[in-house]
Regions:
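C-terminal motif of bacterial Sec signal peptides marking the signal peptidase cleavage site
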Residues: 12-15
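Thiol-based oxidoreductase modules, predominantly thioredoxin-like and allied folds used
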Residues: 67-91
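Typically the conserved alpha-helix immediately C-terminal to a functionally engaged Cys/Sec
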Residues: 52-66
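Sec-dependent signal peptide recognition
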Residues: 1-7
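Non-catalytic, surface beta->alpha helical segment in thiol-disulfide oxidoreductase systems
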Residues: 105-145
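Bacterial signal peptide processing site
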Residues: 17-19
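Short, internal strand/loop/helix patches
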Residues: 86-117
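Short active-site neighborhood of thiol/selenol oxidoreductases, capturing the structured segment around
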Residues: 34-48
Length: 145
């Protein structure tokens, strides 16, 4: 009985914690740099296994390289609130692009390389790619814009 009570309490606390993530912790969202041509935006959630695999690779690539005209951002979908996700996308100037990409089904665990002038998703990076492939995808996207 105690085991059932403990499991139920843990599940409820976890669910409540995910539903009430404050905006300040929900996303790393700032406007892209003025000279940015490409926005590399990670669709992320703390419960997403693909995110946990991809995020450290993206961070390592960011730290090891300088990409002219590329701004990195993360939109956190941990709370599973589409309204909050799309509000953060609007802050980045890519609300329309994200709505066209996802519709009602937001997918996490991918880095979207978006041309800020056209709103086009140039390329998508996923967890299967190593750091060299991620670097190449970002470099190629920057060269196209």
């Amino acid at each position: 009985m105690r085991l059932i009570l403990a499991a139920t309490t843990t599940a409820l606390l976890t669910a409540c914690g995910q539903a009430s993530v404050p905006a300040s912790e929900r996303a790393v969202v700032t406007a892209p740099a003025e000279d940015a041509r490409i926005l590399a935006v990670l669709s992320y959630a703390s419960w997403c296994g693909s995110c946990k695999a991809l995020d450290p690779k993206v961070q390592a690539v960011q730290e090891a390289n300088t990409f002219d005209g590329v701004t990195f951002a993360r939109i956190d979908y941990t709370s599973r609130s589409a309204d909050a996700f799309y509000a953060d996308a609007e802050t980045l100037g890519i609300g329309e692009t994200m709505r066209a990409t996802f519709g009602d089904t937001i997918k996490t665990g991918k880095l979207y390389l978006i041309n800020l002038e056209t709103g086009e998703v140039i390329s998508t990076v996923d967890k299967s790619m190593d750091e060299a492939a991620i670097t190449a995808a970002i470099t190629d996207a920057a060269a196209l814009s």
